[in-house]
């Protein structure tokens, strides 16, 4: 896990190294301060020598200023290193998600990924900053101060030897108890983010059904779960501070009591016991030792929280894409020929029944193929295998007479344009959205594909035309308009294969027919696969595939299927009857 996260430090290695180095220098000079104070008291104040007082006073001031300067520089390096580390980590997760196949993405919810890239990374950033600064400063301070204290008076310093292990056992018990609770907290954060995301995305539906109270109740329930888990964790962590304070005050009292007795016992003779300066120095070292222990306990608490976050981050970073480029990939797709050769597919390999079962299919380049089937008949699953969004479980799929697994994935997908069931537009102008298909497309190219998709007729009515700003998710355009813009975007790719996954369901039949006519006239060499609920959308196709429960029940033209396929005929007649009733 540490090795995985450390890879995100990269260009901030210098700051990551310099922060502990300057912290070590800060501690070195800070450790010298009590020794100089002892000299100032014993040789200057007790002897009434102003020259010695000035001498050690100036040295003390210089050492303190150097220590302060090193501390400030260390803080600057730590801030740069931790912020840069978090930035790189956020980028690494984001880039990793872009590489995921659909199968990988299915493992993580959107809300979970958002939590990992925000809350979890913030926790790791804070822990990283504490590790390269405080987690370095505190142990060095502890060891050096203990060494100096033992050098002054070994017997008194045995107090620390008893206190520190007791403190360590207590901290370990707290860590083991709290870590599982924080794991539950961050999983609940995923659920909370999912509820917020779902509510905001569907806010119009929520309001139209007056379900605000129900949504508030869902939110409150999850929020209360987070509250209860956090309170439980904090109640356990609360023992950390009393434990530290008990150790601090016990050590201070024992040092004061035993140290004072030692000074009195020697009767002022420094050769026989502890001098006043040494006692003050020992007391200062006591404070340094105990403060370093307190800071270490804070680091441990932060690490407890960050550990749960780090595990969640590494879960994403260590996820390997289920789709890999072959060692010697094919970069050119010759044509739009498609062949399904005994294809079996399942999203879950342990599933009892495959989603697609022994599918055999031949499509020639330039053909228009219709796909008809009921809900859950695996129409979308069928076409998602063509651009290799998923890999087949058995069999093979050929595009341009080459197995899709032998292609360079990017090259294959550049030749397959797919308009998914769920049409997505991004915030930006219409032009910016359409140029997802071709970033170098001219205004003339954009207008041409919009004419093919029958989108130009409504775009021209907008005051800003193609520069009209699309809100996030395309909320300021209708469903039919969104579908036509998505079709235009796909056409800009100039693909060899065009797949429309129920992508004209929100447009009227007249516009649907106009789009299909434009396809036949303008892109005759492109293989067109049209998934539709309306038979009218596919009845002119060269072939119509009838799917049912993941199996091809019939293939043929409209007239042939009306004679040979009961399923197709029933769908056609029910839609025809519905149309007649509406008239």
Where are these regions (language model features)?
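Hydrophobic alpha-helical transmembrane bundles that constitute the permease/transmembrane domains
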Residues: 20, 24-32, 65-72, 124-127, ...
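ABC-type nucleotide-binding domain
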Residues: 331-583
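A short amphipathic helical element positioned immediately N-terminal to and/or at the very start
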Residues: 1-13, 113
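Short intracellular "coupling" helices and adjacent cytoplasmic loop segments at the cytosolic face
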Residues: 47, 83, 91-115, 119-121, ...
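Hydrophobic/aromatic residues in alpha-helical transmembrane segments
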Residues: 33, 37, 74, 78, ...
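Transmembrane helix-loop-helix hairpins at lipid-water interfaces of multipass membrane proteins
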Residues: 10, 16-73, 77, 150-155, ...
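Helix-loop-helix
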Residues: 49-53, 148-163, 171, 232-311, ...
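An intracellular "coupling" helix at the cytosolic face of ABC transporter transmembrane type-1 domains
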Residues: 11-13, 99-103, 119-132, 136, ...
């Amino acid at each position: 896990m540490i090795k995985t996260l450390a890879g995100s430090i990269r260009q901030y290695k210098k700051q990551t190294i310099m922060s502990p180095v300057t912290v070590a220098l800060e501690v070195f000079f800070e450790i010298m301060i009590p020794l100089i104070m002892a000299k100032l008291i014993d040789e200057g104040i007790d002897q009434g020598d102003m020259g010695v007082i000035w001498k050690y006073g100036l040295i003390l001031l210089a050492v303190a200023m150097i220590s302060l300067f090193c501390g400030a520089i260390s803080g600057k390096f730590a801030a740069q290193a931790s912020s840069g580390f978090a930035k790189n980590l956020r980028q690494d997760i984001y880039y990793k998600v872009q590489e995921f196949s659909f199968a990988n993405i299915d493992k993580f919810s959107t809300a979970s990924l958002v939590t990992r890239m925000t809350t979890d990374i913030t926790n790791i950033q804070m822990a990283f900053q504490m590790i390269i600064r405080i987690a370095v400063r505190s142990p060095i301070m502890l060891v050096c101060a203990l060494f100096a204290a033992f050098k002054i008076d070994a017997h008194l310093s045995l107090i620390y030897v008893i206190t520190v292990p007791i403190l360590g056992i207590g901290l370990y018990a707290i860590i083991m108890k709290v870590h599982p609770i924080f794991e539950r907290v961050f999983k609940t954060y995923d659920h909370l983010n999912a509820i917020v995301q779902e509510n905001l995305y569907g806010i119009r539906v929520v309001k139209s059904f007056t379900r605000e109270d129900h949504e508030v109740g869902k939110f409150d329930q999850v929020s209360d779960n987070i509250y209860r888990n956090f309170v439980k964790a904090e109640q356990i962590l609360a023992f950390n501070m009393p434990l530290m304070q008990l150790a601090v005050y016990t050590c201070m009292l024992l040092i004061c009591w035993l140290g004072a007795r030692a000074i009195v016992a020697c009767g002022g003779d420094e050769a026989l016991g502890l001098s006043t300066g040494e006692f003050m120095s020992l007391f200062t070292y006591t404070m340094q030792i105990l403060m370093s222990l307190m800071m270490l306990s804070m680091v441990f608490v932060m690490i407890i929280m960050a550990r749960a976050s780090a595990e969640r981050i590494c879960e994403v970073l260590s996820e390997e894409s289920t789709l890999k480029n072959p060692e010697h990939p094919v970069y050119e797709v010759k044509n739009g020929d498609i062949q399904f050769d005994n294809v079996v597919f399942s999203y879950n390999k342990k599933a009892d029944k495959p989603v697609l079962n022994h599918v055999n299919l031949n499509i020639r380049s330039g053909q228009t193929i219709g796909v008809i089937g009921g809900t859950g008949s695996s129409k979308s699953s069928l076409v998602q295998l063509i651009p290799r969004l998923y890999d087949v479980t058995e069999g093979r799929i050929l595009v341009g007479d080459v197995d899709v697994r032998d292609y360079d994935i990017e090259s294959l997908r550049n030749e397959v344009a797919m308009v998914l069931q769920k049409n997505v537009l991004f915030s930006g102008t219409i032009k910016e959205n359409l140029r997802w298909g071709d970033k170098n497309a001219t205004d003339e190219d954009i207008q041409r594909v919009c004419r093919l998709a029958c989108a130009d007729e409504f775009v021209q009515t907008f005051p800003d035309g193609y520069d009209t700003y699309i809100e996030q998710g395309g909320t300021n355009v209708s469903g039919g308009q969104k579908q036509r813009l998505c079709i235009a975007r796909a056409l800009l790719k100039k693909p060899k294969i065009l797949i429309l996954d129920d992508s004209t369901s929100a447009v009227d039949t007249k516009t649907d027919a106009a789009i299909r006519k434009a396809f036949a006239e303008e892109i005759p060499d492109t293989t067109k696969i049209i998934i539709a609920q309306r038979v009218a959308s596919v009845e002119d196709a060269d072939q119509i595939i009838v799917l049912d429960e993941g199996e091809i029940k019939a293939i043929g033209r409209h007239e042939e299927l009306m004679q040979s396929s009961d399923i197709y005929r029933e769908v056609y007649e029910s839609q025809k009857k519905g149309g007649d009733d509406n008239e």
